[in-house]
């Protein structure tokens, strides 16, 4: 009787432990716990006041492909579970936008008040150099729970990305010297084009900080190539806390404040840059003081479409799941 009871107990232990062992093996094959090193590189886009209003116009205008910009960097990735990994990314790149992208649609309009016409006539452009670092969580929904499903065992997986980041940007814009006719990129942060930080200007916005927080959100598709290599395609959007990535946010200020707060040479450049509607395009003359230059209700953002490659190191520790 005692021997029989022991056999039944051993059989029960084996019955309960076998699924756990099988699941552990399957989980290890799917995504072992451990460290990965990799890189990403792809196309970058700025979403702000400068440029087009719609996403479709952004990508389909006939001038977009003339000046593509890119971003890339390195990453360290640690797999906590087949469905969850944490990543540390460091990236550098440039983003760009121009009101010239509205020309194609502006030509079709019959009213000067049309948004395409107004944007094109504003005549602004912007290029930002960006350094960023972010800590993000990578969530693979099809590998959450059971590892027995066909979806969980697939080499190719869709994943979601979310986290927090910190970045530094330096905005540039094209400036044409009226004396020489030479056009070049100049830094515009120190020109305070909307009066930021001007203490003698009523209602002036706070001085712009070039260091900002961001919330990265993304979606991607990755595929295992052998035991260690992984390659994927990822779209990542960075929601920022500033409306000055493109140097345009609110209203046209009285140009006298440039003379009161900047050197004579800086003031001359600032006057030319803050209101570029004087360029003979569709609307002649300058914008009235106090009229809208941008939309202060929406912060700027930027995004990337990147190829992601990383190498998974073999872990010596056992999985906890």
Residue ranges of model-derived segments:
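Residues on the lipid-exposed face of transmembrane beta-strands in outer-membrane beta-barrel proteins
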Residues: 39-43, 74-78, 88, 135-139, ...
């Amino acid at each position: 009787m005692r021997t029989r009871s022991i056999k039944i107990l051993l059989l029960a232990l084996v019955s309960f432990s076998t699924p756990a062992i099988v699941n552990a093996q399957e989980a290890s094959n799917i995504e072992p716990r451990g460290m990965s090193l990799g890189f990403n590189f792809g196309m970058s886009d700025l979403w702000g006041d400068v440029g087009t209003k719609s996403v479709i116009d952004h990508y389909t205008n006939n001038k977009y492909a003339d000046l593509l910009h890119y971003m890339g960097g390195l990453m360290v990735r640690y797999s906590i579970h087949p469905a969850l990994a944490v990543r540390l990314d460091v990236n550098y790149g440039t983003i760009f936008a121009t009101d010239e992208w509205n020309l194609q649609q502006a030509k079709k309009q019959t009213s000067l008040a049309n948004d395409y016409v107004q944007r094109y006539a504003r005549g602004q452009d912007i290029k930002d150099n960006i350094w960023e670092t972010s800590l993000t969580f990578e969530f693979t929904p099809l590998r959450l729970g059971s590892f027995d499903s066909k979806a969980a065992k697939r080499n190719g997986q869709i994943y979601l990305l979310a986290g927090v980041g910190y970045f530094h940007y330096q905005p540039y814009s094209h400036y044409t010297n009226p004396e020489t006719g030479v056009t070049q990129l100049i830094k515009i942060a120190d020109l305070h084009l909307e009066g930021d930080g001007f203490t003698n200007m009523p209602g002036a916005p706070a001085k712009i900080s070039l260091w900002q927080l961001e919330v990265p959100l993304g979606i991607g598709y990755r595929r295992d190539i052998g035991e260690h290599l992984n390659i994927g395609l990822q779209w990542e959007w960075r929601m920022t806390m500033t409306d000055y990535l493109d140097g345009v946010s609110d209203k046209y200020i009285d140009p006298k404040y440039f003379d009161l707060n900047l050197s004579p040479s800086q003031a001359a450049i600032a006057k030319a840059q803050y209101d570029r509607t004087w360029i003979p395009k569709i609307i002649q003359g300058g914008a009235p003081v106090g009229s809208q230059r941008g939309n202060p209700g929406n912060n700027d953002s930027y995004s990337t479409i990147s190829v992601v490659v990383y190498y998974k190191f073999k872990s010596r520790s056992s999985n906890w799941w």
